[in-house]
């Protein structure tokens, strides 16, 4: 008898991401359904990330992904035909086997991830289940707090701000719908506040939809955010808190061993003092990548000093890699994981990293990349994991709002059951 869940087709293609760069999209077909997934790419990438395969040469300035697409169509597809689409772990294991390298450099992490996610979506579709329910079961019901990147600096913007992201977190809202309304209202007030202070040319948006005003000192965006939150009618800290992504690896001078912030040099201890000052002055509840990706000692220090009141997030530190995460847990470095599926390469590995973090009492933030697509898989993943947090940009640009809109739909589907993480975003024990 024919298995309706048998994979009968796998097709990859080259499409464009939100920055106009090529990326990989894959369709997976069964007898009764199909799944489509497109992969993102990052601008500030960790050294230990899985390798995104690019073509080189003149085409698309070397950023083409025809090799990755060909690897799906010629190497992966023939192996997947006939397999049961519900065998996610077996399929992910096969993808790793076909590549054969630790950093997925043969077939390409972009090829592998697109297939892995498309398989999960095809399975959910074939079973007539929403993706979050297929991945998380009946216990997937926590809607995440958005960490919305409304002011951009670093490599995401063309200004002199050294810290990469200044985010708002609507922790005091009662539902996701209310939370995203608060974010949207604050974002529009912020635009007005920035225009008044810096002029109409200061509200250009960065890769993630946030504004990139001509600021230099790290306190400037924090002051402007407090003003915008208050003018929007909310209480800073109690209703809307602040979060930072420092992306410190970009600020580290290998020769001097020091960090450069606002034109000044800081050693590890001095930078820690800066963070202590900022967290005592502003309602900052989360700091991502406060130190260089190999500065384990710096992460241990800040976690000891501030971890009781501030979430210390490892992004470039962990790169969603279970080995690096386990090392961090042993050392007491950071207390939260930034989960980016394309840093590790398969859905199974990403979910394993999340479970490792949860078991250690670490928080998990499901995250986008700066180069995104209209694919909203991470919205479903955040709910499937009951992660309690999602980082997917400002409430602007369709590639960012696709995720927020999907979360609005999921909350509607889960009416009467859905719980918004709110102030318990770090430890979601409902």
Curated annotation (Swiss-Prot):
Binds a second Mg(2+) ion via substrate during catalysis. PROSITE patterns: ENOLASE. Its main location: cytoplasm. InterPro entries: Enolase, Enolase-like_C_sf, Enolase-like_N, Enolase_C, Enolase_CS, Enolase_N. Pfam families: Enolase_C, Enolase_N. Coiled coil: none annotated. Keywords: Cytoplasm, Glycolysis, Lyase, Magnesium, Metal-binding, Secreted. It catalyses: (2R)-2-phosphoglycerate = phosphoenolpyruvate + H2O. Its cofactor is Mg(2+). (2R)-2-phosphoglycerate binds at residues 164, 340, 369-370, 391. It is found in: Cytoplasm; Secreted; Cell surface. Mg(2+) binds at residues 245, 288, 315. PANTHER family: ENOLASE (PTHR11902:SF1). Belongs to the enolase family. This is Enolase. It comes from Pyrococcus furiosus (strain ATCC 43587 / DSM 3638 / JCM 8422 / Vc1). The lineage of its organism: Archaea, Methanobacteriati, Methanobacteriota, Thermococci, Thermococcales. The gene is eno.
């Amino acid at each position: 008898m024919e298995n309706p869940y048998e994979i009968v087709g796998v097709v990859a293609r080259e499409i464009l991401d939100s920055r106009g760069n090529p990326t990989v999209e894959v369709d997976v077909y069964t007898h009764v359904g199909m799944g489509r997934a497109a992969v993102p790419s990052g601008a500030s990438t960790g050294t230990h990330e899985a390798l995104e395969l690019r073509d080189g040469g003149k085409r698309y300035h070397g950023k083409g992904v025809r090799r990755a697409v060909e690897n799906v169509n010629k190497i992966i597809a023939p192996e997947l035909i006939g397999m049961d689409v519900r065998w996610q772990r077996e399929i992910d294991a096969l993808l790793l086997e076909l590549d054969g390298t630790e950093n997925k450099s043969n077939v390409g992490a972009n090829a592998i991830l697109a297939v892995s996610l498309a398989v999960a979506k095809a399975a959910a579709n074939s079973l007539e289940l929403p993706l979050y329910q297929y991945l998380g079961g009946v216990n997937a019901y926590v809607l995440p707090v958005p960490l919305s990147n409304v002011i951009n600096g670093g490599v995401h913007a063309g200004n002199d701000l050294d810290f990469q992201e200044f985010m708002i977190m609507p922790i005091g809202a009662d539902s996701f719908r209310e939370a995203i309304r608060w974010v949207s209202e604050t974002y529009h007030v912020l635009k007005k506040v920035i225009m008044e202070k810096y002029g109409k040319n200061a509200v250009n948006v960065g890769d993630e939809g946030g504004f990139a005003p001509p600021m230099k000192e790290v306190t400037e965006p924090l002051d402007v955010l407090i003003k915008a939150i208050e003018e929007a009618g909310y209480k800073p800290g109690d209703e809307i808190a602040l979060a930072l992504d420092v992306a410190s690896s970009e600020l580290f001078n290998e020769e001097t061993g020091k960090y450069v912030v606002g034109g000044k040099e800081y050693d590890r201890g001095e930078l820690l003092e800066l963070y202590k000052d900022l967290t005592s002055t502003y309602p900052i509840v989360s700091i991502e990548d406060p130190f260089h990706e190999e500065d384990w000692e710096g992460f241990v220090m800040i976690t000891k000093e501030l971890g009781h009141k501030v979430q210390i997030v490892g992004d470039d530190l962990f790169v969603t890699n279970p080995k690096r995460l386990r090392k961090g847990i042993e050392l007491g470095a950071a207390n939260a994981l930034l989960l980016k599926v394309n840093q590790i390469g398969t859905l199974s590995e990403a979910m394993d990293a999340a479970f490792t973090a949860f078991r250690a009492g670490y928080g998990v933030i499901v995250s986008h990349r700066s180069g995104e697509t209209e694919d909203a898989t991470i919205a479903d993943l955040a709910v499937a994991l009951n992660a309690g947090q999602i980082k997917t940009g400002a409430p602007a640009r369709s590639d960012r709002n696709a995720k927020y809109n999907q979360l609005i739909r999921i909350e509607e589907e889960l009416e009467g059951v859905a719980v918004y993480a709110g102030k318990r975003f770090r430890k979601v024990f409902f």
